[in-house]
Amino acid sequence: MATLDVNPELYQAQLADKIARLKAMFVDYSMPELEVFESPVANYRMRAEFRIWHEGDDMYYIMFNQETREKYRVDQFPAASRLINDLMPLLMDAMKGSPILRHKLFQVDFLSTLSGEILVSLLYHRQLSEEWITAAQALKQRLNDEGFNLNLIGRARKMKVVLDRDYVVENLQVNGQPYVYKQVENSFTQPNAKVAEKMLEWAVDCTQESKGDLLELYCGNGNFSLALAQNFERVLATELAKPSVEAAQFNIAANQIGNVQIIRMSAEEFTQAMEGKREFNRLKDAGVDLQSYRCNTIFVDPPRSGMDIDTCKMVQGYERILYISCNPETLQENLQVLGETHQVVRFALFDQFPYTHHMEAGVMLERKK
């Protein structure tokens, strides 16, 4: 994790800089007015990872300065959720007093939620014994007795010990409606939960009064699929990562949403299937008849690399395109293609990563008349 200067007094200035940069990047496009969604100024980040430094009998969390690579001690981390900050000193004190828990511990990862659940992963440069499991169970019990809703994972080379779950269940509010999301350790989740709620509300607003079905590429754990399902007859969503697909299935059931179908495919494979270039048994096995879907709208939330040219061409086949981007530079590249056939009708900046140069953007495109 990068060096971060969390200074609430500077929040508006850093946001203004992002607004100016994003507008400048798209000055050559006919863009509508930019909608801006702010972050909480502190305690916004639901995940955090720290290295562990051992110094005699002492042990503490450290991070590294990105520019100098110098380590520095971290006892509290203002970017992280209050839950993480509350747990950090108690966890460290408990581990310091346990030779078996501290021996060759080199990293601690936290995954917290707005729902109150938290998952802690302890990473070791040694194999984990039965003695470690006993000590870890006692640690978990001790912290839960202090009021935390905590699960623990121990990791070592080719080894993973789960006490008792390797996921948390998050609860996000979308226009007052609660949605339950299973978030699995080491799988992608939106790091800024409050901004994630705003992104979902914006996407729901963009797709009001939609007709037909929705196709979604790169759906992850179904984060957007579930919230958007209310605006469509059916949702067909694709995702390649197996843990994310399994989490998405859990989330569909937990939210009792009956019109979402998730299939495990890459965007590139799905493009081939849609164009009839290849047949996939997994589509048949899942009972998915692509020809039965009437998808007028497509939703894409690609990785930082954006969409490849073939996927862009496939996406151009839809009347409306909703595109969430964690890298506006690749969004810019993709818009050079999409802009041939579509025009941008909504444009948004989501400040997922305050006090960094990273920006999250959203655009809604409609086919040119």
UniProtKB/Swiss-Prot annotation:
Q: What is its EC number?
A: 2.1.1.-, 2.1.1.35
User: Which terms are listed as keywords in the entry?
Assistant: Methyltransferase, S-adenosyl-L-methionine, Transferase, tRNA processing
Q: What does the entry list as the binding residues for S-adenosyl-L-methionine?
A: Q190, Y218, N223, E239, D301
Q: Which domain of life is it from?
A: Bacteria
* PROSITE patterns the UniProt entry points to: SAM_MT_RNA_M5U, TRMA_1, TRMA_2
This enzyme catalyses: uridine(54) in tRNA + S-adenosyl-L-methionine = 5-methyluridine(54) in tRNA + S-adenosyl-L-homocysteine + H(+); uridine(341) in tmRNA + S-adenosyl-L-methionine = 5-methyluridine(341) in tmRNA + S-adenosyl-L-homocysteine + H(+)
User: Which residues are the active-site ones?
Assistant: C326, E360
Secretion signal, residue range per the UniProt entry: none
Gene Ontology molecular function terms on file: rRNA binding; tRNA (uracil(54)-C5)-methyltransferase activity, S-adenosyl methionine-dependent; tRNA binding
The top EC class is transferase
A single GO cellular-component term from the record reads: cytosol
Q: Name one GO biological process term.
A: tRNA methylation
What family is this protein classified in? Belongs to the class I-like SAM-binding methyltransferase superfamily. RNA M5U methyltransferase family. TrmA subfamily.
Say what the protein does: Dual-specificity methyltransferase that catalyzes the formation of 5-methyluridine at position 54 (m5U54) in all tRNAs, and that of position 341 (m5U341) in tmRNA (transfer-mRNA).
- In Swiss-Prot or TrEMBL terms, this protein is called tRNA/tmRNA (uracil-C(5))-methyltransferase
Q: Which organism is it from?
A: Vibrio cholerae serotype O1 (strain ATCC 39315 / El Tor Inaba N16961)
